[in-house]
């Protein structure tokens, strides 16, 4: 039995509405994959897209970014979609850098904005 691809969905506070809109627009495509998301983002997506089965980890500032980073390092997250807000100062910016660094180190497809995420989801489909 083949394991389904696991996609991580994360969004900064000012990008959460955009992530929810993205998930709604691609709900059918995303339903083919296992989804993991940070706590708040995952809850918002789950409310908007009840057909998706989302595994929620802790909120980003409480360690959720690091939990997903560990999943990338273990090979259990194969795609990262992280809507970053480059205009807001973030107290957990070090965690964000560590997460995107791991995405690069382990050479997984990674989208940091909606335009790239749109292309990535179409390529996976």
Curated annotation (Swiss-Prot):
SMART domains: MGS. Residues 1-125 form the MGS-like domain. It holds the Pfam family MGS. Gene3D superfamilies: Methylglyoxal synthase-like domain. Its EC number is 4.2.3.3. Substrate binds at residues 12, 16, 38-41, 59-60, 92. The active site is at residue 65. This is Methylglyoxal synthase. The lineage of its organism: Bacteria, Pseudomonadati, Pseudomonadota, Alphaproteobacteria, Hyphomicrobiales.
């Amino acid at each position: 039995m083949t394991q389904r691809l696991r996609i991580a969905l994360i969004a900064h506070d000012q990008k959460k509405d955009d992530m929810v809109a993205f998930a709604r627009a691609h709900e059918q495509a995303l339903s083919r994959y296992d989804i993991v998301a940070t706590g708040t983002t995952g809850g918002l997506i789950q409310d908007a897209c009840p057909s998706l089965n989302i595994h929620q980890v802790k909120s980003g500032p409480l360690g959720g970014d690091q939990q997903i980073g560990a999943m990338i390092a273990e090979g259990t997250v194969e795609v990262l979609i992280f809507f970053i807000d480059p205009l807001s100062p973030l107290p957990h910016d070090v965690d964000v850098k560590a997460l995107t660094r791991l995405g690069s180190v382990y050479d997984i497809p990674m989208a940091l904005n909606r335009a790239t995420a749109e292309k990535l989801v179409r390529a996976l489909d």
